[in-house]
Amino acid sequence: MNSLIMVIIALIAAYFIGSTPAPYLAGRIFKKIDIRTVGSKNMGSMNVFYNVGFWPGILVLTTDIGKGALAMAVANWLGEGLGIQMLCALMAIAGHNYPVWLKFKGGKGGATAIGILAYMMPEGIPIYIACFLILMAITRFPTLSYGISFISFILVAWLGQHDMGKVLFSLLVVMIPILMYIPRMKEIKNKAGSGNAKRAIFRRNLKERL
């Protein structure tokens, strides 16, 4: 088959893999709610944890992480090189953030970004997990913890693999969810006030949903 056609197939497949609306489906299946209308109204795993339940949240988190890895794996299976695999990774994030099934209103791409970087640099997974757990223990702030922990993959690409291409790509992948989250952070701060912003972002009753 023509190589250009294979590239197009890989990119389209990546978008539709990314657009699988796991948070929306979890809300409908487990609680008969539209996740876009409760909590933060975000199509992400944290909103599912808080408003649907712990195990549905784990399922959604695993699915969203898997979407990023699967998009790259499919491109690899189709015989595409790392450059096309990276483009497919970005298409998976685009699908997650702008799913055609939900009028292009999706999540922010954080979990999908984790899957992408974990697929590219599996040796960074234990470092990422360790960083996340340490930061969570210190800050009790999940969004901040997983965001800062992304640095572990960037360091693996830079110091471990000495691959500047992967470093730059990792930075791009990490910046997408960060930029997507800025409006939400401003909204929370404006509603809660600076003194209560952290409490509003992270509700400590997650254990009650076990």
UniProtKB/Swiss-Prot annotation:
| GO BP | phospholipid biosynthetic process
- Entry's InterPro entries? G3P_acylTferase_PlsY
- Membrane topology term: Multi-pass membrane protein
EC number(s) on file: 2.3.1.275
Whether Lipid metabolism counts among this entry's keywords is yes
> What are the UniProt keywords, alphabetically?
Cell membrane, Lipid biosynthesis, Lipid metabolism, Membrane, Phospholipid biosynthesis, Phospholipid metabolism, Transferase, Transmembrane, Transmembrane helix
> Which Pfam families does the annotation name?
G3P_acyltransf
Instruction: Show the GO MF annotations.
Output: acyl-phosphate glycerol-3-phosphate acyltransferase activity
Subcellular localization(s) per the UniProt record: Cell membrane
CC per GO annotation: plasma membrane
* Top-level taxon of the source organism: Bacteria
Q: What is known about its subunit structure?
A: Probably interacts with PlsX.
Q: What does this protein do?
A: Catalyzes the transfer of an acyl group from acyl-phosphate (acyl-PO(4)) to glycerol-3-phosphate (G3P) to form lysophosphatidic acid (LPA). This enzyme utilizes acyl-phosphate as fatty acyl donor, but not acyl-CoA or acyl-ACP.
Q: Which protein family is it in?
A: Belongs to the PlsY family.
- Put simply, this protein is called Glycerol-3-phosphate acyltransferase 2
